[in-house]
């Protein structure tokens, strides 16, 4: 149980920071747009990466830095595109809360954007494959309990964030609130894109 809690605690601490993925989950939760799908894909992606890290695949990332380089540049390009889209939306679109959710993006489109936020983020490989993978070796022969704890942390966090966001819906019935959120998200995405390149 102690090993499980160590994995859970470290897992939560690594994903609590406000980043591109968390901002996207929050936005989808407020819009009530494919919330389960987004939360599930984020948590499942983490589960896959954590499992690979504990299984020893973090070694590949350290031995082949090209993996991290490709993820960094592709991630920066994606974040730049998304950031510019959010800023444009903040200044040009009319924002009205739709209680039935935003139907402008299909489940497939939403899933692809969600997966891009996860798999094109070079930090996710360092956090899951390398960091969690290497720390799990301290818990031999119970390293899979550590992994289960970290995976549970991801599921708990993303579903809490996605579904907890509905508490903010009253605030986002006003168009100005959406504009501010879009502006903040756009700024954060562009800042993260720059941070990947410098």
Regions found by a protein language model. Give the residues of each.
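Short alpha-helical packing/oligomerization segments
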Residues: 139-156
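Juxtamembrane boundary at the C-terminal end of a transmembrane helix
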Residues: 2, 194-198
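Selected transmembrane alpha-helices and immediately adjacent juxtamembrane segments
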Residues: 107-128
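Interfacial loop-to-transmembrane junctions
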Residues: 163-187
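Membrane helix-loop-helix hairpins that form the core translocation module of multi-pass transporters
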Residues: 33-103, 110, 164-167, 187
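Transmembrane alpha-helical segments of integral membrane proteins
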Residues: 51-52, 131, 155-171
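Juxtamembrane transmembrane-helix termini in multi-pass membrane transport proteins
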Residues: 2-69, 129-143
């Amino acid at each position: 149980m102690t090993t499980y809690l160590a994995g859970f605690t470290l897992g939560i601490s690594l994903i609590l920071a406000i980043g591109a993925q968390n901002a996207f989950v929050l936005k989808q939760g407020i819009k009530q747009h494919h919330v389960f799908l987004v939360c599930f894909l984020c948590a499942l992606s983490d589960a896959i990466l954590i499992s690979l890290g504990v299984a020893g695949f973090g070694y590949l990332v350290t031995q082949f830095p090209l993996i991290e380089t490709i993820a960094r540049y592709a991630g920066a390009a994606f974040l730049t595109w998304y950031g510019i889209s959010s800023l444009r939306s903040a200044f040009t679109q009319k924002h009205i809360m739709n209680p039935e959710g935003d139907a402008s993006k299909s489940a497939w489109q939403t899933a692809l954007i969600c997966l891009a936020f996860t798999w094109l983020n070079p930090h996710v490989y360092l956090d899951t494959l390398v960091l969690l993978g290497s720390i799990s070796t301290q818990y031999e022969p119970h390293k899979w309990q550590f992994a289960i704890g970290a995976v549970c942390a991801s599921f708990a966090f993303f579903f809490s964030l996605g579904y907890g966001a509905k508490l903010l819906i009253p605030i986002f019935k006003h168009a100005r609130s959406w504009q501010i959120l879009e502006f903040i998200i756009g700024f954060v995405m562009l800042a993260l894109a720059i941070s990947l390149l410098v």
